[in-house]
Amino acid sequence: MSYRRELEKYRDLDEDEILGALTEEELRTLENELDELDPDNALLPAGLRQKDQTTKAPTGPFKREELLDHLEKQAKEFKDREDLVPYTGEKRGKVWVPKQKPMDPVLESVTLEPELEEALANASDAELCDIAAILGMHTLMSNQQYYQALGSSSIVNKEGLNSVIKPTQYKPVPDEEPNSTDVEETLERIKNNDPELEEVNLNNIRNIPIPTLKAYAEALKENSYVKKFSIVGTRSNDPVAFALAEMLKVNKVLKTLNVESNFISGAGILRLVEALPHNTSLVELKIDNQSQPLGNKVEMEIVNMLEKNTTLLKFGYHFTQQGPRLRASNAMMSNNDLVRKRRLADLTGPIIPKCRSGV
């Protein structure tokens, strides 16, 4: 508090008045002390960091005319440097003469039958346009005029060869309607285990809070009817992915999970994939198009987990490397082959999967 009271005495002082009362010697002393405190002048604006260099005594009177005369005299007395190789003026090679273009032969006058000459003489531009289209002279007209004339037996261009063609009017495509799902009501229906609710679609609802999405994951742990859960484009992040991973370890009904186009990193994706061995009901998982790439290390770990899984049939992710992409494709093909064999044999027990150690 005492330090602040000392500063109060200097609050109303006029710095310009104090600096104006200092002598030149005192100003130099102050400048030297400031140089010691801030040698790089980092606290000053860039335009004020250069010291005053105009205080030196002049070496003599400045006369512009005499300076120009001196520079001109010095330029005349200075000898030009001689060329290392003197210019002889010798011309080598041949002078380029452009070739004469061949002259087009004069077209002979074409004589037509009197009926054709009379018809062409009295034809309008619109009729000539249709005739040119029929004869294949499409360079005289636009594409729209040409195809309209070919597709109609009557005159379709009423304005002639030089008419302005309007572009084709396309029907406006309306924007997709926003997602009409009631977030709070759907959450309550999941908590109440509503048997009529089998698909939850929260796609492109960007204002869902993260705690609400985590509440969905918690509610799905005890739900017995929801088979499809999609949160595409909901700005979900790693905490949501962690909650969904814990849900997959408990839920035994969910078949499809879609978390594409979100902000889930590699750690969140790994948690989701690592939860697959504890889940036997999920057959489709989509994780593509996240805000940041997963990386080669994460992709290899994902493939290792997919090769150990025997129930997942569809995996929505585009691998950047060919090796993980091929291994994941083989794993999904093997799982689908197991389903096909079980369906053909009509077995109720588990089928021993083919060994994938050599994949």
Swiss-Prot record:
A family per Pfam: Tropomodulin
Gene name of the encoded protein: Tmod1
Protein family membership: Belongs to the tropomodulin family.
Gene3D superfamilies (UniProt xref): Ribonuclease Inhibitor
UniProt-recorded name of the protein: Tropomodulin-1
UniProt-listed InterPro entries: LRR_dom_sf, TMOD
Subcellular location: Cytoplasm, Cytoskeleton
Keyword Cytoplasm: yes
GO biological process: adult locomotory behavior; lens fiber cell development; muscle contraction; myofibril assembly; pointed-end actin filament capping
Species annotation: Mus musculus
GO CC list: actin filament; COP9 signalosome; cortical cytoskeleton; cytoskeleton; membrane; myofibril; sarcomere; striated muscle thin filament
PANTHER family from the UniProt entry: TROPOMODULIN, TROPOMODULIN-1
Lineage: Eukaryota, Metazoa, Chordata, Craniata, Vertebrata
Function of the protein: Blocks the elongation and depolymerization of the actin filaments at the pointed end. The Tmod/TM complex contributes to the formation of the short actin protofilament, which in turn defines the geometry of the membrane skeleton.
Keyword Cytoplasm: yes
Superkingdom of origin organism: Eukaryota
Keywords, sorted A to Z: Actin-binding, Cytoplasm, Cytoskeleton
Region (Tropomyosin-binding): 39-138
Subunit structure, as described in the record: Binds to the N-terminus of tropomyosin and to actin. Interacts with FLII.
Tissue occurrence: Highly expressed in the erythrocyte, heart and skeletal muscle.
Ranges for region Disordered: 36-61
